[in-house]
Amino acid sequence: MSIVDVRTPDPKRFIPGATGDWEVIIGMEVHAQVLSNSKLFSSASTEFGSEPNANVSLVDAAMPGMLPVINEECVKQAVRTGLGLKAKINNRSIFDRKNYFYPDLPQGYQISQYKDPIVGEGKIIISVGPDRQGQFEDVEIGIERLHLEQDAGKSMHDQHPAMSYVDLNRSGVALMEIVSKPDLRSSDEAKAYLTKLRSILRYLGTCDGNMDEGSMRADVNVSVRRPGEAFGTRCEIKNVNSIRFVGQSIEYEARRQIAILEDGGAIDQETRLFDANKGETRSMRSKEEAHDYRYFPDPDLLPLEFDDAFVEALKADLPELPDDKKERFVRDLGLSVYDASVLVSEKAIADYFEAVAEGRDGKAAANWVINDLLGALNKAGKTIEETPVSPAQLGGIIDLIKDGTISGKLAKDVFEILWNEGGDPAEIVESRGMKQVTDTGAIEKAVDEIIAANPDQVEKAKAKPSLAGWFVGQVMKATGGKANPQAVQALVKSKLGIEE
C-alpha cells in the first residue's frame, strides 16, 4: 500500500527544534468494541465487569473441534459505522488468521481481516481551534479502512507474587479497528479526531466509547520530518486509553524523536508504551511487520458476502449524525456554528438541548444549556447524564422569562435552587416571592427615589447618556432584582430626558 501525503505543510503546526522546524506525522488505529450482546463468533455475553472467566464459551477458550459462527449483529454494526464514516462498504470481505503467541490468546491466532476488510476508504471532518483570532479550522482526515477482529483476553500480573492469571471474558469480543491515513499533523488534531470519531460511534450506537472501560483504545503512530520531506520512521504507541493521554504521548514522542535526529541518531521502528504517571513513552518491542504474523484466510470461515439491499436497509435506518445535526441547528434554529458544535459534541447533550428547545426559542435554549447547565456540570465534575436539572425544568425557567414572570437575573437564582433542591420552577417562583415587578407605578416610584437621591449622577447622565445604566442597576438593586429591566430602562431614560 502506497502512502499519499495529502496535507500541505502548515507553519502553524511546525515544532521548532534546535536546528530548524520539524513536522509531526500522525496516524491512528482505533480499536472500538462493537455494541452487541454476544461476541463475534460465539454466543457468550459481552457484559462489562463480570467475574473473571464468567463469559467464556468453548469457542472463546479454543476447545478442540469448536468452530466459529459469525454474529450478524456485529456485521451490521460494522456496516453502520462504515456508512457513518462516509466510507466504501465492501460487499465481500475475508477473515484471516493473525498468528502470534500470548497467554491470553488461547487459539494461538487472532481472527482478523487483512487484505479484504469489510469497510474501505472514508473520511472524518474535524474542527481544530480556536486560534488567536477565535477562528476554527475544518480539516478532512482520511480513513484507510475498518475491519472486524476478535479481542484477546486479559493477563493479570498483580494478583499473585509468583503467578500471572488470565481472564478470557474479553476473548472473542468483537472489535472494529478503524485505521486513519497519516493525515494528522498535531496533538490537537489527534485529540479532535478521536473525540469526533467517538461522537460518531455513540450517535450510531455501534460503540459506547467508554475508554475508561477499555471499549475504545488507540494505537498512535508517530513520526517526524523536515517540512515537505518524505515520511520518517514511525513508532507505534500502543493502547492509549484516554484522549488526554493521546495528546500527551504525541507531544512527548515527537520531542523524543526530534532530539535523536538532531543529535545525529536514527529512529528505530518500534512499539512503545505511554507511561501516564511519568508522561513519557518507553520501548516495548521492535515493531512487527505484516509478514511476521503469517496472515492467511481462516479455513473455518467462508468469505463474508452481502448484497446492496442489505447495506441500503441499514443506511435507511441511520440516525442523524453530528455534522448533519450541527447544520440543522445553524439553519433552522439560528445558532452560531460554535454553539451548534458544542451542542452536538455528545449525543446526550444534543438530545437534552432538543428537549429544551422544543417549542421554544432555540438561541435562548442554547444559551441556557451551554452557559448555565454545562458550566454547572463542568464545575461539579458531572456528566450530562448526571444532571440534577431536567430538560423540562430548564425549559420551565425559559418559559417564565418569556412571559415576564421573572427576570434573567432571578432566573439564575431559580436555576441554582433547582440544581440544589429540585422542584418545579413556577412553584419555586410563587412560593418564594420571586415574581418580577411589572407594576409601572411601583417601578416609577423606585426610579424617582433613586434619581432624587443622586442629583450629581443625574447631571452626569444627561451629559453622557451611557451612564443611565447606573440608575438601572440601582433600581434593580433596590427592588431585589424583581423589577422588569426593560420597564426600568425606559422609565430612567424618560425621567432623565434621554432619547431612545
From Swiss-Prot:
Its EC number is 6.3.5.-. It catalyses: L-glutamyl-tRNA(Gln) + L-glutamine + ATP + H2O = L-glutaminyl-tRNA(Gln) + L-glutamate + ADP + phosphate + H(+); L-aspartyl-tRNA(Asn) + L-glutamine + ATP + H2O = L-asparaginyl-tRNA(Asn) + L-glutamate + ADP + phosphate + 2 H(+). One of its GO terms (biological process) is glutaminyl-tRNAGln biosynthesis via transamidation. The keyword Acyltransferase does not apply. Pfam families: GatB_N (PF02934), GatB_Yqey (PF02637). One of its GO terms (molecular function) is asparaginyl-tRNA synthase (glutamine-hydrolyzing) activity. Keywords: ATP-binding, Ligase, Nucleotide-binding, Protein biosynthesis. SUPFAM superfamilies: GatB/YqeY motif (SSF89095), Glutamine synthetase/guanido kinase (SSF55931). PROSITE patterns: GATB. It comes from the Bacteria. Allows the formation of correctly charged Asn-tRNA(Asn) or Gln-tRNA(Gln) through the transamidation of misacylated Asp-tRNA(Asn) or Glu-tRNA(Gln) in organisms which lack either or both of asparaginyl-tRNA or glutaminyl-tRNA synthetases. The reaction takes place in the presence of glutamine and ATP through an activated phospho-Asp-tRNA(Asn) or phospho-Glu-tRNA(Gln). NCBIfam families: gatB (TIGR00133), PRK05477.1-2 (NF004012), PRK05477.1-4 (NF004014), PRK05477.1-5 (NF004015). This is Aspartyl/glutamyl-tRNA(Asn/Gln) amidotransferase subunit B. It comes from Rhizobium meliloti (strain 1021) (Ensifer meliloti).
